[in-house]
């Protein structure tokens, strides 16, 4: 997705340090950042924030982190958080490769990856969020019962991710090869998911855990 540059976005985000971490000021203190000590769920690559803000509104007993590196998109997540008055959702504006700088070992209960960039060329495989380098980070920050939820419309990325996770020592608790056909009504659509689905694209989904988190 090409993002149109918003020159004012960075200053806007910096004006809300209570909601947005721009430079790691809360690194290593994620739990303390929230008003209540509750389980932490992360969405990596939140886009415009429809998924994560809907989850946060539905589950006030869970603390959520939206992690998105594009400042020109993050402002839309911030707008939603403010409009909805969410106190259980914070935003990190940084790259996922920095995850273990922000979260302590075992601090996270769930990670969401929704419609991540597939990076289709083989030479870019290490940039995929299900590449083994990222899986190692997820394993480090997830607690013993933690899991990973993954959705995509890209069949190639889905197949790659199944193989990558399996080789890394993960197992799958749920696999949907046509999510919207099998959906029980609990699925929360992202902005892109609705667009892809309206075009007739098949949506793939899985839930996975590590055999040994540590």
UniProtKB/Swiss-Prot annotation:
Q: Which reaction does it catalyse?
A: guanosine(46) in tRNA + S-adenosyl-L-methionine = N(7)-methylguanosine(46) in tRNA + S-adenosyl-L-homocysteine
For binding S-adenosyl-L-methionine, which residues are annotated in this chain's numbering?
A: 43, 68, 95, 117
Active site per the UniProt annotation:
117
Look up the coiled coil feature and give its residue ranges.
Answer: none
Q: What protein family does this chain belong to?
A: Belongs to the class I-like SAM-binding methyltransferase superfamily. TrmB family.
Stored PANTHER family: 3-DEOXY-D-MANNO-OCTULOSONIC-ACID TRANSFERASE/TRNA GUANINE-N 7 - -METHYLTRANSFERASE (PTHR23417), PENTACOTRIPEPTIDE-REPEAT REGION OF PRORP DOMAIN-CONTAINING PROTEIN (PTHR23417:SF14)
> What protein name applies here?
tRNA (guanine-N(7)-)-methyltransferase
- Read off the lineage from the record: Bacteria, Bacillati, Bacillota, Bacilli, Bacillales
- The primary gene name is trmB
